[in-house]
Amino acid sequence: MNLNLRPASECKFDAVSLGEVMLRLDPGEGRIRTARSFRAWEGGGEYNVIRGLRKCFKMNTAVITAFADNEVGMLMEDFICQGGVDTSLIKWMKTDGIGRICRNGLNFTERGFGIRGAVGCSDRANTAISKATPDDFDFEYIFGTLGVRWLHTGGIYAALSEQSCETVLAAIKTAKKYGTIVSYDLNYRPSMWSAIGGQAKAQEVNKEIAKYVDVMIGNEEDFTACLGFEIEGNDADLKELNLDGYKKMINEAAKTYPNFKAVATTLRTVKTATVNDWSAICWADGEIYKAKDYKGLEIMDRVGGGDSFASGLVYGLMTTGDAELAVNYGAAHGALAMTTPGDTTMATKKEVEAIMGGAGARVQR
């Protein structure tokens, strides 16, 4: 497949993300409600993707976000710097000292174990990035003057506020103006859309955004809720994806949105919180490519696995243009990311490629 990427020589960044980055507070093996200490990480649905591109795949990336200008914001910046992601595009917003004007988001997340599923409890109302408008970012400068080869954003950020919807559209329209490839993860969260118009608003916004997207990421529920497409013959409990039905739906979506060059989703069957069957598929040029199956994958922390899949997928598409190879990069990277704590990857490209090639868990000496 030909994505017609901008040459690296004319762009400062290989990839940038647009979205919220939160402080993740992790009680480890315990529960949020009984914790006496938390381990801190950074994470965000859009940011995790470009963080993986930088840390695992050594691409030059930056994050477009906003923080309240206080100690917590500086902690977040420090985490991002440790991941190697450029912080020069962060908007720092004045605060009144108690968070009435704006604040930084918190995400309390339990990993789950066995029959006890993972639990997320986010505290993200009135955050700096949710209050940001298109005027807070100079997209002409970012995509025109600096140059960006790939923009990744998604439905979690779009659902934060009315302003977020507008900011996503402004960013992707400017990105397309300068030839930047756009990927978008639908990532439908009913609770996030409920305050700004519910599913009707989600469809209104996502149908407009979809007109500018080159690589769309989303499962069957996302496509139904956000874009109004249905899969025939799918399991009512959404435990197993009907691949023939998914392919038919994607072909229909591609007719509606001929700008789609690739569509991808992970395939996850939850046995327990710590054992999942895992794979992924990618549609491109009318064909469906399925990644290697990871049956009975043992998981330490599932949060961010889908974002790490997207990192590998984007890397594969950017460097090879081969959808089959790209979806295998994505599935392997996502699988490895779920074997370590935190939202973001601790894997190397060498490890990803070894897993793709069938390597096991023998001791490396």
Predicted regions and their residues:
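Hydrophobic beta-strand scaffold residues
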Residues: T61, T87, V182-Y184, I217
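Conserved phosphate/ATP/ADP-binding segment of small-molecule kinases
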Residues: R189-E287
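Positively charged, low-complexity intrinsically disordered leader regions
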Residues: M1-R33
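Conserved N-terminal subdomain of the carbohydrate kinase-like
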Residues: N60-G155, V352-R365
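A short helix->loop->beta-strand "cap" motif at the edges of active sites that frequently abuts
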Residues: K58, K177-I181, Y257-K261
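Alpha-helix C-terminal capping segments
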Residues: W41, N48-N60, Q82, G316-T319
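Active-site nucleophile and cofactor-binding loops and adjacent substrate-binding regions
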Residues: S37-Y47, T65-D69, K91-I101, D301-G305, ...
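Conserved post-catalytic alpha-helical subdomain immediately downstream of the catalytic base
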Residues: A273, Y289-A359, R365
